[in-house]
């Protein structure tokens, strides 16, 4: 695959793209789950770990300092399984998200090609539009699962939600349908530029990197890592705002950070964070996010390419006369 001049978006049927995308999301999610829990807890921490003055209103909130210390503390106080809190809704989200994302990406790309005909737009622009559209559709469709993942990961020793079914019932009763979509504006505002930049960068880098003789065909993985790091850094403040909006509601003061402020709206939340935490507050958890994004994207893209290739080979073998 790496040495092929074909683009990912031109290969396979819709069903094959969906299967490959779902498989890639499932595997990637399990691998990076502990880093995801750490990232969420750092993002929700509105007090500075290094500024004692910000500790005056902790209300029993925990203080996390860095990736490894946070992992150790979670393991020590909550057990090994705590590093996979929220993994059930997260697995469902990643499988669904990846399948919808790749399928929509391919469909939009083919639609653009049919629309413009001979006057085909540049590959980078095509990838940006298709990636942004795929991200927006997938984010909206799977957002309730994303919110549940965040709330489960934010739980400490005290269990607010005992199961996935109980959490859905509790939110529906106490917050209504809108409760499942808190922070959606930040989610879509984040994912559209992220996926556009990611796919445009990935498609640009994949072919030239694929011509290099790299071990285990890792040109795809390298392109995925670079594309992810570039895109993730640019839109990280929206990711943090989304997380803080997701834990708003009647359970806001019961998570590991019991002093989470009341937020309302994307830009008002951004303004509140800048005023009270400075611009650095918008980038809490960025380091672990990049550590997480790199292996997650590498595993996702590498697995997607390989699974799709296996499906194409299997289809060809089925069509070949025996």
UniProtKB/Swiss-Prot annotation:
Record's subcellular location: Mitochondrion inner membrane
Keywords: Membrane, Mitochondrion, Mitochondrion inner membrane, Repeat, Transmembrane, Transmembrane helix, Transport
Coarse class of the protein's main subcellular location: mitochondrion
Coiled coil: none
A cellular-component GO term for this protein: mitochondrial inner membrane
InterPro entries from the UniProt entry: Mit_carrier, Mitochondrial_Carrier, Mitochondrial_sb/sol_carrier, Mt_carrier_dom_sf
Residue ranges of Solcar repeats: 12-111, 122-208, 215-310
GO biological process terms on file: thiamine pyrophosphate transmembrane transport
Membrane-spanning intervals of the chain: 18-38, 92-108, 128-148, 180-200, 221-241, 285-302
Membrane topology type: Multi-pass membrane protein
One protein family per Pfam: Mito_carr
One Gene Ontology MF term: thiamine transmembrane transporter activity
Function: Mitochondrial transporter that mediates uptake of thiamine pyrophosphate (ThPP) into mitochondria.
Similarity field: Belongs to the mitochondrial carrier (TC 2.A.29) family.
Name the record gives this protein: Mitochondrial thiamine pyrophosphate carrier 1
Upper lineage: Eukaryota, Fungi, Dikarya, Ascomycota, Pezizomycotina
Name of the gene encoding the protein in the UniProt record: tpc1
């Amino acid at each position: 695959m790496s040495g092929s001049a074909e683009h990912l978006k031109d290969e396979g049927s819709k069903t094959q793209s969906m299967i490959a995308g779902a498989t890639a999301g499932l595997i990637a999610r399990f691998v990076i789950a502990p880093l995801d829990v750490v990232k969420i807890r750092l993002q929700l921490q509105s007090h500075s770990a290094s500024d004692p003055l910000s500790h005056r209103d902790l209300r029993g909130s925990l203080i996390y300092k860095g990736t490894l210390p946070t992992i150790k503390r979670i393991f020590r106080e909550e057990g090994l399984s705590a590093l996979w809190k929220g993994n059930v809704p997260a697995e469902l989200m990643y499988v669904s998200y990846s399948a919808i994302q790749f399928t929509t990406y391919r469909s939009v790309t083919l639609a653009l090609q049919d629309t413009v005909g001979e006057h085909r737009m540049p590959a980078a622009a095509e990838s940006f539009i298709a990636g942004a559209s795929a991200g927006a559709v997938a984010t909206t469709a799977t957002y309730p699962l994303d919110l549940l993942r965040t709330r489960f990961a934010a739980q400490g020793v005290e269990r607010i939600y005992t199961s996935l079914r109980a959490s859905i019932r509790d939110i529906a009763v106490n917050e209504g349908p809108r409760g499942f979509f808190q922070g959606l504006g930040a989610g879509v505002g984040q994912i559209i530029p992220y996926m556009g930049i990611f796919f445009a960068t990935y498609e640009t880098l994949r072919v030239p990197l694929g011509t290099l003789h790299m071990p285990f065909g890792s040109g795809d993985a390298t392109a995925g890592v670079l594309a992810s790091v570039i895109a993730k850094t640019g839109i990280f403040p929206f990711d943090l705002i989304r997380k803080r909006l997701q834990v708003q509601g009647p359970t806001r003061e019961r998570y590991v950070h019991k002093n989470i402020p009341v937020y309302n709206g994307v830009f008002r939340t951004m303004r509140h964070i800048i005023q009270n935490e400075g611009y650095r507050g918008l980038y809490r958890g960025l380091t672990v996010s990049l550590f997480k994004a790199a292996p997650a994207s590498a595993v996702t893209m590498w697995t997607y390419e390989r699974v799709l290739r296996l499906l194409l080979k299997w289809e060809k073998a089925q069509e070949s006369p025996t």
